[in-house]
């Protein structure tokens, strides 16, 4: 049995779970999430816990078992506490600002880059070089953070660009030759 899949998911107070066939809807203080799961996985609500069961020990069912449980846990966690991803801007003159709902990045291009967050995702700019992305959907928060980072990925020579908060950029040495040649 999958070690992750067999763990029950505790449903906290104030979180409402609706099971309609293979479509699960979770509603909590931070919002509502709905997702369709594989029809082979059997999801039940027993004594305040969500339990995922699989029909057989086939390889694909074992893989889906852990995946389904983790996705359900992320849904419950998201509507209860929410998820946050932090980004940092490294570079002279690199700034982030918020205009209404949009994020405006000044990162060395000839034009400012504007990014509109999807519904249910909130962008905060606590400092000119810091960005915080918050939301109840873990996948959407992570995807938006990856899209913002992709606008100007950190380069290996000076480390300039947009990086995740605790990301370590592997640095390279610059050109060594060319000093004594004429």
Swiss-Prot record:
Disulfide bonds: none
Domain of life: Bacteria
Keywords recorded for this protein, A-Z: Ribonucleoprotein, Ribosomal protein, RNA-binding, rRNA-binding
Annotated InterPro entries: Ribosomal_uL6-like, Ribosomal_uL6-like_a/b-dom_sf, Ribosomal_uL6_a/b-dom, Ribosomal_uL6_bac-type, Ribosomal_uL6_CS
GO cellular component: cytosolic large ribosomal subunit
Any Pfam family matching the protein: Ribosomal_L6
GO BP annotations listed: cytoplasmic translation
Keyword Mitochondrion: no
GO MF, any single term: rRNA binding
Family from the record: Belongs to the universal ribosomal protein uL6 family.
UniProt subunit comment: Part of the 50S ribosomal subunit.
Purpose of the protein: This protein binds to the 23S rRNA, and is important in its secondary structure. It is located near the subunit interface in the base of the L7/L12 stalk, and near the tRNA binding site of the peptidyltransferase center.
HAMAP family attached to this UniProt entry: Ribosomal_uL6_B
Protein name in the entry: Large ribosomal subunit protein uL6
Organism: Desulforamulus reducens (strain ATCC BAA-1160 / DSM 100696 / MI-1) (Desulfotomaculum reducens)
Higher taxonomy: Bacteria, Bacillati, Bacillota, Clostridia, Eubacteriales
């Amino acid at each position: 049995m999958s070690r992750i899949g067999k763990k029950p998911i505790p449903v906290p107070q104030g979180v409402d779970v609706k099971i309609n066939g293979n479509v699960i809807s979770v509603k909590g203080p931070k919002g509502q999430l709905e997702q369709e799961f594989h029809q082979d996985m059997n999801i039940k609500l027993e004594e305040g816990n969500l339990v995922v069961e699989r029909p057989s020990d086939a390889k694909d069912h074992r893989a889906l078992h852990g995946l389904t449980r983790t996705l359900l846990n992320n849904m419950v966690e998201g509507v209860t506490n929410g998820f946050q991803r932090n980004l940092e801007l490294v570079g002279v003159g690199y700034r982030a600002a918020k205009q209404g709902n949009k994020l405006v990045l000044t990162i060395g291009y000839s034009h400012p880059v504007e990014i509109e967050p999807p519904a249910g995702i909130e962008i905060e700019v606590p400092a000119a070089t810091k960005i915080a992305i918050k939301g109840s959907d873990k996948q959407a928060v992570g995807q938006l953070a990856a899209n913002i980072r992709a606008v100007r990925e950190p380069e290996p020579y000076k480390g300039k660009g947009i990086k995740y908060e605790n990301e370590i950029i592997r640095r390279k040495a610059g050109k060594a030759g060319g000093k004594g040649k004429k």
